[in-house]
Amino acid sequence: MYPRAGELRPSQGEEMKRIEAIVRPHLLEAVKSALQEVGITGMTITEVKGYGRQKGHTETYRGIEYQIDFVPKIKIDVVLADTLLAAAVDAIMKTAKTGKFGDGKIFVSSVEEVMRIRTGERGEQAV
């Protein structure tokens, strides 16, 4: 029933994708709602810090300025069927875009296999 080491095999022709979206923290609820509207039922959220062209910012604490190199962001991880990819990316783009530096990034990659630990389900049924 469950695959053993070395027995992993592709699911029955299902193409799975992974979206990693880095967005502004205050937009999390809006992005989450937009993804749910297009049929995404599960996601993993992680608080992350980083910088790109935005290059951090300056904060003042007790009269002293500090350079903050890493900017707080939220990483949203979603594994989904290839058929939902375009709608999910579009939902993130429309919801997370402010037009200013620091809007974030979206990374899309292929997923070889997905398995639900509890049941052993594979592929799209495991998501």
Specify the residue positions occupied by each region the protein language model found.
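Positively charged, small/polar-rich N-terminal and surface patches that mediate targeting and assembly
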Residues: 1-127
